[in-house]
Amino acid sequence: METDLNSQDRKDLDKFIKFFALKTVQVIVQARLGEKICTRSSSSPTGSDWFNLAIKDIPEVTHEAKKALAGQLPAVGRSMCVEISLKTSEGDSMELEIWCLEMNEKCDKEIKVSYTVYNRLSLLLKSLLAITRVTPAYRLSRKQGHEYVILYRIYFGEVQLSGLGEGFQTVRVGTVGTPVGTITLSCAYRINLAFMSTRQFERTPPIMGIIIDHFVDRPYPSSSPMHPCNYRTAGEDTGVIYPSVEDSQEVCTTSFSTSPPSQLSSSRLSYQPAALGVGSADLAYPVVFAAGLNATHPHQLMVPGKEGGVPLAPNQPVHGTQADQERLATCTPSDRTHCAATPSSSEDTETVSNSSEGRASPHDVLETIFVRKVGAFVNKPINQVTLTSLDIPFAMFAPKNLELEDTDPMVNPPDSPETESPLQGSLHSDGSSGGSSGNTHDDFVMIDFKPAFSKDDILPMDLGTFYREFQNPPQLSSLSIDIGAQSMAEDLDSLPEKLAVHEKNVREFDAFVETLQ
């Protein structure tokens, strides 16, 4: 489709759409894990905070999404779909919902890519966070365990709604207009759960009260063993290292001016899940979020829930491979300001050496490994970055001189000058003239006493006296009654005399009225 976008805007838009598609898959899959997700807010956004949301990516899901995209982007005629299905321990399966990210031909030529499209995609992603938790599949995912698990599948192409059965419902999450088309995010979900109602998914208690394997329980005791979520085929070597988080977002390290850089990444260590074979299915589940692969469906991720007894593995990288230790770069005191990362790490990642004598303890090594990256639309001074390595959205508006937070007047405002009140000065002058010893005034603290609605002539008044005095204020002069004024009876008595005077001078009054006309 021919558009009037320049090369930079087109590059920006493609990047926004790509990362929006990846974040969409993350939000949908994480909403079907069966666990509540609690994310703490942060005042210092990192490079992974795309669209102003702190969504922690699961590496396996990102890898699966990128493999499904295969370098493509959702466009007119090409839709990205995420299918959520349910599979029981007996082998029965049922599709629950299908999320579709597509684009139509309706264009908005006047919209700005840099700000407007980015902010609207952020709102659409927030709407998706809410909608994924109101469909029936969310309630089923919270109850998954030994009896059934929730699967997901990502595919690119025509939407397949035949598996949802009759009478399925559709909901449109939202739309965002772009210069190349309108992005639409919608969901079709099953409402007929007759397959579920005919079964009693009740967890039978064990015969003995002893748990032999307290780490993992197989969700499919009668089916084939589950493969770990490491995306290896049968012919691949068991020592294949899974790509790290920063490698999964390599597009962030390009010369893109309006997107945040890569995630809060490790410039030395890469995430390496344990390489487990088919025969070790019992230990295959605690991988990032306790997931496994179905042998018959290698692209479907098994997500056992909390009732299945599957623990969640700590979300930390695995240390200890010799290849990673060989890539550790050393920094001399002369060039300890910035140390370039090794080729295996992200291109724009820089570390700061914290060792003053060239020797680094294990704690210092960990400090030099992780670097905080500037996130989307963040213009906060950071010690670890320079103008040459700064890669933030709209970098042209960034300040030319990056100041440290210690000298930043917005972070540490200067102390206000101390002002001495006249009352305090007079008290100090009286004390100094009274004697040279000063022992009399050492036991007192001089304060500047300024009572509310007070004047200088009533400064000795305390708060109680002030309150009592103004509790009964004097009456207003406009409401005061003149004692010498005539009463109503006297006014009525003098009325005939006033009328007689008026009748006598009626001509003068008439002439005066005529002059007024």
Curated annotation (Swiss-Prot):
Where in the sequence is Phosphoserine found? S355, S356, S361
InterPro entries given in the database record: ATG13, HORMA_dom_sf
Outcome (variant: I131D): Decreases interaction with ATG101
Q: Where is this motif: LIR?
A: 444-447
- Could you state one GO biological process linked to this protein? response to mitochondrial depolarisation
Would the keyword Cell inner membrane turn up in this protein's UniProt record? no
Region annotation (Important for interaction with ATG101) maps to: 127-134
Composition bias type Polar residues, residue spans: 342-358
- Give me the Gene Ontology terms describing cellular component: Atg1/ULK1 kinase complex; autophagosome; cytoplasm; cytosol; endoplasmic reticulum membrane; mitochondrion; phagophore assembly site; phagophore assembly site membrane
Q: What keyword terms does UniProt attach to this protein?
A: Acetylation, Autophagy, Cytoplasm, Phosphoprotein
Location(s), subcellular: Cytoplasm, Cytosol; Preautophagosomal structure
PTM annotation, UniProt:
Phosphorylated by ULK1, ULK2 and mTOR. Phosphorylation status depends on nutrient-rich conditions; dephosphorylated during starvation or following treatment with rapamycin. ULK1-mediated phosphorylation of ATG13 at Ser-355 is required for efficient clearance of depolarized mitochondria.
N-acetylmethionine carried by residues: M1
Assembly, per entry: Part of a complex consisting of ATG13, ULK1 and RB1CC1. Interacts with ATG101. Interacts with ULK1 (via C-terminus); this interaction is increased in the absence of TMEM39A. Interacts with ULK2 (via C-terminus). Interacts (via the LIR motif) with GABARAP, GABARAPL, GABARAPL2. Interacts (via the LIR motif) with MAP1LC3A, MAP1LC3B and MAP1LC3C. Interacts with TAB2 and TAB3. Interacts with C9orf72. Interacts with RB1CC1; this interaction is increased in the absence of TMEM39A.
Read off the domain note.
The LIR motif (LC3-interacting region) is required for the interaction with the ATG8 family proteins GABARAP, GABARAPL, GABARAPL2, and MAP1LC3A.
Return the similarity comment.
Belongs to the ATG13 family. Metazoan subfamily.
Q: What does this protein do?
A: Autophagy factor required for autophagosome formation and mitophagy. Target of the TOR kinase signaling pathway that regulates autophagy through the control of the phosphorylation status of ATG13 and ULK1, and the regulation of the ATG13-ULK1-RB1CC1 complex. Through its regulation of ULK1 activity, plays a role in the regulation of the kinase activity of mTORC1 and cell proliferation.
Q: What is this protein called?
A: Autophagy-related protein 13
Specify the species.
Homo sapiens (Human)
Q: What is the lineage of its organism?
A: Eukaryota, Metazoa, Chordata, Craniata, Vertebrata
Gene name of the record: ATG13
